Amino acid sequence: CLSLLAKTVPNMIVSSADLCNSDKTDGFIKGGATVISRDNFAGGFLQAGVAELTMACVCIGITLHGGMLAACGTFFVFSDYMKPAIRMAALMELPVKFIWSHDAFRVGEDGPTHEPVEQEAQIRLMEKMKNHSGRNSMLVLRPADCNATTVCWAMAMENMTSPSALILSRQNIEPLPEGTPYEYCRKGAYISAESDENPDIIFVGNG
């Protein structure tokens, strides 16, 4: 998705907290964006270093300036470092796109320090809080596979009244069964496997 956005959204800047190869924000570079440096400010990708809060604040500043779209990525567990900026983006109703990968315990060799547990609950609490305009403070999206991710990216890019969060996995995931109504992502949920009229158990999945 980021590779396509690099080709089609010239006023977009993407940043990563020293993790672009891991959180796949380097897709923006692969799509043609050049890296911003002290000698070249014409690029579209900002290497923020290990500075998650600063990165989020820079994206807020870019968005406040106007005329630009900003997105930033890191591991989901590090969203904790960004909370003050996320909260301010929500209060100011800024359409910053937060890309958080490695959303579960499958984080490779990094171990429990990099395994998000309580982070989604915190972000979800912000989602349904009404802002000063009476709208949700945040759009939180956790797609189930690559097809749902495409729809969720479209939703995030269309959302210009609040921050958007894309909570993504580390590992490759098999697509859901053929015929899954991915367009229902826009409604908040969809049925991927039907049952009879009176099921004994209903499994509800998130991500």
Report residues per predicted region.
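Thiamine diphosphate
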Residues: 1-175, 181-185
